[in-house]
Amino acid sequence: MSNFKNIIPKRTYLERGQAKHRLHLGELEKKVDYGKRREIYKKKKKIENVLKEKIMTKNPDEFHTGMVHSRVTEDNVLVREEKVLKKEVQLKNKRQELKEQTNDLYNKLKKINKRLSNYQMNIPLRYVFNNSHELYNENEIYTLKAENKKLKKRGDLIQKKYNGLINMKKNLLDQIRKLDNKYITTYHKVDGYNIVTDKGKTPYRLYQPRLK
């Protein structure tokens, strides 16, 4: 008989909603929220019990390999010793860092040179920057000025961008000159600059890309 009772569809009872005058007390917790909170609490409790057991069964004279390269200070702070690398490995790492720095700087310089050449090739700078053009006749000189305000604004913007690119180029060249270049040599001059090694040092040959 009980099996037949379960077949008959019954009304599904919804959970009670929260009244508006009690919203200031916070959201009403539903059964799903309680289940999630219960699972999280049980997980934390398990971890806590495992850690408690470890502390209770810990041997004070226990040794592990991490103690060789680390120590605990009076303030109970763990201090680890730095790894001592061979000179060959240190030189290799230094060369790799310098190689990455120089490549990055030269790539940036190449992009700036390309943009500058585009400005010079595609835009007649003397017309746009000065906003004037001189016409020579047999006896007289005429100056034609751009009266259009939009053209003047455009010319000023292009001039600012052009000057900014030149300043960026100067800064990049200064950064390249300031690099610690004891172990790097370049065989291509870039804008009249070439890296030279110190005497007696073993150079690391780094071939840089050709630039204008």
Swiss-Prot record:
Sorted UniProt keywords: Nucleus, rRNA processing
Origin species: Plasmodium falciparum (isolate 3D7)
Quaternary structure annotation from Swiss-Prot or TrEMBL: Component of the ribosomal small subunit (SSU) processome.
UniProt name for this protein: Probable U3 small nucleolar RNA-associated protein 11
Functional description taken from the UniProt entry: Involved in nucleolar processing of pre-18S ribosomal RNA.
GO cellular component, one term: small-subunit processome
Similarity-based family: Belongs to the UTP11 family.
GO biological process, one term: rRNA processing
InterPro entries reported in the protein's UniProt record: Skp_dom_sf, SSU_processome_Utp11
Protein's cellular compartments: Nucleus, Nucleolus
Main location: nucleus
